A protein has these predicted regions:
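Surface-exposed, glycine-biased beta-strand/turn segments
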Residues: 19-97, 103-105, 122-132, 137-138, ...
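Exoplasmic/lumenal beta-rich domain surfaces
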Residues: 96-131, 206-216, 243, 250-311, ...
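Short edge beta-strand/loop segments characteristic of extracellular beta-sandwich folds
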Residues: 228-232, 416-420, 486-494
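Conserved structural position at the C-terminal beta-strand
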Residues: 231, 325, 537-539
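Surface-exposed, short loops/turns at beta-strand junctions within beta-sandwich domains
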Residues: 312-318, 456-458, 524-532
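Short, solvent-exposed loop/turn segments at the edges of extracellular beta-sandwich modules
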Residues: 326-331, 540-545
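Proteolytic processing hotspots in large secreted/extracellular or virion-associated proteins
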Residues: 346-359, 385-431
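Proteolytic-maturation and junctional protease-sensitive modules
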Residues: 406-460, 500-502, 509-510
Length: 553
């Protein structure tokens, strides 16, 4: 009882401190119009949680973005993917706000970025600034909203991070007064999972999925099981759906599991693959949140009982399960179902594999001419691994099969494959390829002492290939370049992938961005209209093969 009281007091203190911090921060809206969200913090995504709020920009780009509080611009990043263009503002309260997918920065910052890009002849850049360089006040316009990088439509991606650790924290408590939400989360599916070799559901060792509308369907289990739920949240004023902030599971009125998405460290992002049913996601695209914590999953937002969320069914009686779903605004929905304890045989677990990946140790998997190193905690539970090698002595390298089924790997693992033959003397032309049927994808790689070495974070079939084919360059709308100055190229490489590119007009470097394989001029106003020009474009792939073309317009 005393421990429960101490825990309650501690939680109360933490919540009070957080509420005080929110009140003291007093952030303003980044926009001068009423805001709606297209995504919330913690929304489940492939391989990561959504780390901020996506704010709608009324379907257009170019909306002025206001700094949410006093501070200074500490960083500006320009990428082809990801956030595209992002601006970071460090605040005196220990937080940094991040504004992603912007189309441009405030004039003084934009000029600094452009100066760097032209001086270094590069589009991609990551610039850090000191406190006195670009101070900003609450409400200052720091950028214009856009659709840059990996964005599916115009919006602002707004993050809050702890300045010292880089930890992502949920911005919703700071901005919920600007939003309206009277809608409770909605579940769609319940999963009941037997732990293989220790439990059984309806006579088999496979999961049982129940639609929310079919929860009265009889389910019989014995031994150790756990459950999961698929659910979405909704808000007023939009048709979008969002991630569920808090999921709590009770069994016979005792809490056995809770997940609350209020903070995530960068290294925890891919641990989402141990929280969700990764096999179901990759096979059907359905997102089911497990109410179970694998032994190797260190994700802090998961809170489980001493059995990591597992429930032992060892009596022939009804076990009462109850899910409580809650959003940031206190809207709550409950789902209840019964699992009937029924004594039944539990099949022995016999994985069809010749190797194992253990979650709590470094795994070194070797075959003749191949080595894979999977560090500790890079799988979330012990995983069967089927290994094999195929091919004949005439190949550059054997095909190596590293089959762990639909199992996620936490981060990059070292993979080395030895060369059996070198049809091309230039060692920079070799790369490791992952393949499945007709699908092939370059994993990159560097040559060292007869081996090609790279890093991979998914398993499958790997080999070595050679790339001596240069990239392709195709002009788009060349006939209108002189008048429109909308200069674009389609570039692609079928082997190792695009490595770099540069464009010069009349002998001077011109800035181009790359999105979805299209090179697009960034400063068309720098190209004089209506006069002849000579353009030179070079594209180099990851193995150093280069294509150079000249155009007159």
């Amino acid at each position: 009882m005393r421990q429960k009281m101490i825990l309650a007091l501690a939680l109360g203190g933490m919540l009070s401190a957080q509420a005080q911090h929110v009140q003291e921060s007093n952030f303003c809206s980044p926009f001068d119009f009423p805001i709606l969200l297209s995504a919330n913090f913690g929304e489940l995504r492939p391989n990561h949680f959504h780390n901020g709020l996506d704010i709608k920009t009324q379907g257009v780009t170019g909306k002025p973005i206001h700094c949410i509080a006093d501070g200074y611009v500490s960083r500006v990043a320009v990428l082809h993917g990801g956030y595209g263009q992002a601006i970071y503002v460090t605040h005196p309260n220990g937080l940094t706000s991040v504004y992603g997918h912007v189309i441009s920065f405030a004039k003084n910052i934009q000029a600094c970025v452009r100066q760097y890009q032209y001086a270094h002849e590069t589009f991609v850049c990551d610039l850090k600034f000191q406190p006195g360089q670009f101070p900003v006040k609450k409400g200052d316009i720091i950028a214009l909203s856009g659709n840059e990088g990996a964005s599916a439509g115009p919006h602002l991606h707004l993050e809050l991070r702890r300045t010292e650790t880089g930890e992502y924290i949920d911005p919703m408590p700071y901005f919920k007064h600007l939003l309206k939400d009277s809608k409770a989360p909605v579940g769609s599916l319940i999963g009941i999972y037997p732990i293989q070799g220790k439990g059984v559901v309806n006579g088999v060792s496979h999961k049982k999925l129940l639609a929310i509308g079919n929860l009265k369907q009889p389910v019989h289990a014995w031994g150790e099981i756990y459950t999961g739920i698929s659910a979405k949240d909704y808000m007023d004023g939009t048709s979008n759906f969002y991630g569920v902030h808090s999921v709590t599971l009770y069994v016979d009125s005792v809490q056995v599991f809770n997940s609350t998405t209020d903070k995530v460290l960068p290294d925890e992002n891919r641990m989402i693959n141990g929280f969700t049913d990764y096999e179901e996601l990759t096979r059907t695209r359905r997102l089911i949140m497990r109410s179970y914590k694998f032994p190797g999953n260190r994700l802090r937002l998961l809170h489980a009982n001493e059995n990591r969320g597992a429930v032992t069914i060892n009596e022939e009686r009804d076990y009462h399960f109850r899910y409580v779903l809650e959003d940031n605004f206190g809207n709550r929905r409950t789902y209840q179902f019964i699992v009937k304890g029924k004594r039944q045989d539990i099949p022995e677990y016999k994985p069809e594999a010749n190797e194992m990946l253990y979650w709590n140790r470094t795994n070194v998997i070797q075959k003749p001419g191949m080595e894979l190193v999977v560090p500790r905690y890079y799988v979330y539970e012990d995983v069967p691994l089927r290994t094999d090698m195929r091919g004949d002595s005439s190949l550059i390298a054997f095909d190596y099969i590293l089959d762990a089924g639909r199992t996620p790997i936490h981060s990059y693992c070292d993979l080395s494959i030895g060369l059996r033959h070198m049809p091309v003397a230039d060692t920079t032309k070799y790369y490791i390829v992952q393949k499945a049927g007709k699908w092939r994808s370059s994993m990159g790689g560097k040559y060292a002492n007869g081996w090609i070495k790279t890093r991979v974070r998914s398993l499958g079939t790997f080999s070595v290939d050679v790339d001596t084919i240069a990239p392709q360059i195709t002009p788009i709308g060349q006939g209108g370049w002189r008048t429109s100055r909308n200069i674009r190229f389609r570039i692609k490489d079928m082997e190792s992938g695009i490595g770099s590119y540069k464009v010069y007009i009349d002998g001077k470097f011109v800035l181009f961005g790359l999105k979805k394989g299209i090179l697009v001029i960034q400063d068309p106003e720098n190209v004089k209209k209506g006069v002849p020009h000579k353009l030179e474009v070079t594209v180099t792939d990851q193995c150093g093969n280069m294509t150079r073309k000249e155009y007159k317009f």
